[in-house]
Amino acid sequence: AKTGNDYSRRVEEVAKAEGAEVLVIAGKTEEDIASLESYEDKQMFLDELGLEESGVNRLIKKAYALLNLQTFITAGEMEVKAWTYHRGWKAPQCAGVIHTDFEKGFIRAEVIKYADYIEYGSEAAVREAGKLGIEGKDYVVQDGDIMHFRFNV
């Protein structure tokens, strides 16, 4: 929903008076978006409605911000996975999200910035460009970091 309706505007007024936020989402529109198969179809539908992103995406982003959460990524040959952590956590704490042994035996983290990965297109190209970071226990993980943890237990 781009503008909401009379009811949502009344809710917005109450929320504003209480210092709270409101996120207007149109359930039927979200159902229609979810029923589309491809990313391209979803994007075309959003464009036709004059929306930049779905309400579900906006809800997730707002919830992450409200809860002070961020995401780091791990990638192997068989799987790429996103992990949720609290903003401000250091590398060993984030390693512990995967497994407590990773945190206990933390040695270092190899870090690729998401923007560098997009720019160079592969881990090998990032390494070749000298953009792979080797970080220790005091590194504060950044949203979107691609992490490879080294540990010994």
Identify the residue ranges that each predicted region occupies.
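C-terminal-of-GTPase-core extension/linker across diverse P-loop GTPases
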Residues: A1-Q142, M147, N152
